UniProtKB/Swiss-Prot annotation:
Keywords: Cytoplasm, Glycosidase, Hydrolase. Hydrolyzes trehalose to glucose. Could be involved, in cells returning to low osmolarity conditions, in the utilization of the accumulated cytoplasmic trehalose, which was synthesized in response to high osmolarity. It is an enzyme of class 3 (hydrolase). Substrate binds at residues 168, 175-176, 212, 221-223, 292-294, 324, 525. This is Cytoplasmic trehalase. Pathway: Glycan degradation; trehalose degradation; D-glucose from alpha,alpha-trehalose: step 1/1. The keyword Hydrolase applies. GO terms for molecular function: alpha,alpha-trehalase activity. The active site is at 326 (proton donor/acceptor), 509 (proton donor/acceptor). It is found in: Cytoplasm. Disulfide bonds: none annotated. It catalyses: alpha,alpha-trehalose + H2O = alpha-D-glucose + beta-D-glucose. The keyword Hydrolase applies. It comes from Escherichia fergusonii (strain ATCC 35469 / DSM 13698 / CCUG 18766 / IAM 14443 / JCM 21226 / LMG 7866 / NBRC 102419 / NCTC 12128 / CDC 0568-73).
């Protein structure tokens, strides 16, 4: 698809006094109606049994003690530890000694668990290297080899090598990997592309979907569904033929559409919402409604300040993580307050564009295999989704795509997610032209395009720019003939990354691009991470198209 033109269109301990009271939104379903509208999901088909327990499930009160005591600066550290013995024995020992006067929780953890390996300190960048050389030399540093599953570890073993983003992220991530893959072929690493293709197909076969990442605590959710884009990339770069992945694409589609057939208008189940007119659109979802293992304390604190039932807040926080945009004003009712998060009440433009791509890919590959019936069915599904998106998510007055608040039945915020319909070929030429004007006027800066127009302190908001958004905007506008805007974003982003690299000799997760010299992007629940997989991948691909800045 690259550069192609589109031709056709203990609870008491957790309580604090707050000055907020929970007022039921008149557009929200009341609790008794909520139970009917959002029935409890069944266990995900294919989910492995005991060895897929999350650390919170496995260590119970020990887990909560460790996380609430903050013995590690990062909430993700303990979930990533591996036990040195049977977890049940550890839990029994903990229950025997925890009330001793001289009990040391940190020492107990260090005696009974292997702490996560730290890889970043092993690599020192050569300041003489060009940006391209730096990226090419980083791939081995970010590569993890297949390993036997450490008993009771949260890490899910994969059959082949894979790339991790870097920093605190020592596992592979679903949608990150697509943007990382963009650069692997340019660096001559088709071997890694093949490995990652096999890994994602394997996860679909074994779990029925691609999890957020290869950790047990990520199994209850996915991320933006980009496997169809990966398949397209594999074929373009001569890695694998698309036909071999048709069954995997269908399995992923079934995961995202689970329960759709039984819904009546204005009902939702898992990822699916049936709209008032009967059409189907999708939202982000997580099958759990507990604090995230990897951000347990942060989630508990957020829920305490919400004034809402904690399980609702936890579900929305988890769904926000599934979106990849964790977190953003896109999911907040009060843009300055994370506790107002309502992710499951929004129908996101990017998610539905990615699913349009998935439906189209299934139709196209079915046609290649001579399966006319499946081709016709999925072509109809894709067209129906596009019609529903145009009906509910297209703001004709302002010429932009926006998320849709299905509980309040109104359009939500404008963000850079609006460019995804262009990237997947779902927009008309008129929509692309009008969206281009809006992006120029509202999101474009000398350093690239902003995630949103709103400065909230969340990392997926102004003033931050992110590599995947730049790539989809560049390619999306160029595919619709707006080479000028696409090239401007490309040169601006390359300049941003290169200026920062010349000063600091590293690439990072996100950049502050709202004026002045590019610097580290802020916000989020964890310190800025360097490495960084998808920045490397996008920049390496752009260097091949535009040359080094």
């Amino acid at each position: 698809m690259l550069n192609q033109k589109i031709q056709n269109p203990n609870p008491d301990e957790l309580m604090i006094e707050i000055d907020l009271c929970y007022e039921l939104d008149p557009y929200e379903l009341k609790l008794d109606e909520m139970i009917e509208a959002e029935p409890e999901p069944e266990m995900i088909e294919g989910l492995p049994a005991s060895d897929a327990l999350t650390p919170a499930d496995r260590y119970l009160e020990l887990f909560e003690h460790v996380q609430s005591a903050k013995i590690f600066p990062d909430s993700k550290t303990f979930p990533d530890c591996a036990p040195k013995m049977d977890p049940l024995d550890i839990l029994i020992r903990y229950r025997k000694v925890r009330r001793h006067r001289d009990f040391d929780l940190r020492q107990f953890v260090e005696n009974h668990f292997w702490l996560p390996e730290v890889y970043s300190s092993e690599y020192v960048s050569n300041p003489e290297n060009s940006l391209k050389e730096h990226i090419d030399q980083l791939w081995p540093v970010l590569t993890r080899e297949p390993q036997d599953h450490i008993p009771w570890s949260s890490l899910l073993a994969l059959p082949q090598s894979y790339i991790v983003p870097g920093g605190r992220f020592s596992e592979t991530y679903y949608w990150d990997s697509y943007f990382t893959m963009l650069g692997l072929a340019e660096s001559g690493r088709e071997d890694l592309l093949k490995c990652m293709a096999d890994n994602f197909a394997w996860m679909i076969e074994n779990y029925g979907h691609i999890p957020n990442g290869n950790r047990t605590y990520y199994l209850s959710r996915s991320q933006p569904p980009v496997f169809a884009l990966m398949v397209e990339l594999f074929e373009e770069d001569g890695v694998r033929g698309a036909r071999r992945y048709l069954d995997h694409l269908k399995m992923e589609y079934a995961f995202w559409m689970d329960g759709a057939e039984s819904l009546i208008p204005n009902q939702a189940y898992r990822h699916v919402v049936r709209m008032p007119d009967g059409s189907l659109l999708n939202r982000y979802w997580d099958d759990r409604d507990t604090p995230r293992d990897e951000s347990w304390l942060e989630d508990v604190e957020t829920a305490k300040h919400s004034g809402r039932p904690p399980n609702e807040v936890y579900r929305d926080l988890r769904a926000g993580a599934a979106s990849g945009w964790d977190y953003s004003s896109r999911w907040l009712r009060d843009a300055g307050r994370l506790a107002s998060i309502r992710t499951t009440q929004f129908i996101p433009i990017d998610l539905n564009a990615f699913l349009f791509k998935l439906e189209s890919a299934i139709a196209n590959i079915s046609a290649l295999k001579g399966d006319k019936e499946t081709e016709t069915l999925f072509r109809q599904k894709a067209n129906a989704r596009r019609d529903a998106v145009n009906r509910y998510l297209w703001d004709d007055e302002n010429g932009i795509y926006r998320d849709y608040d299905w509980r309040r039945e109104q359009l939500a915020l404008f963000s850079a997610a609006a460019i995804v319909p262009l990237y997947v070929g779902m927009a008309s030429h008129e929509q692309a032209d009008r969206l281009g004007d809006a992006v120029r006027n509202r999101l474009l800066t000398p350093g690239g395009i902003l995630a949103t127009e709103y400065e909230t302190g969340e990392q997926w908001d102004k003033p931050n720019g992110w590599a995947p958004l730049q790539w989809m905007a560049i390619q999306g506008f160029k595919m619709y003939g707006d080479d000028h805007l696409g090239d401007e974003i490309a040169h601006s982003w390359l300049q941003t990354v290169n200026l920062f690299y010349q000063q600091h000799h590293k690439l990072i997760e996100k950049y502050h691009i709202a004026g002045g010299t590019p610097r580290e992007g802020g916000g989020g629940e964890y310190p800025l991470q360097d490495g960084f997989g998808w920045t490397n991948g996008v920049v390496r691909r752009l260097i091949s198209l535009y040359g080094e800045p």
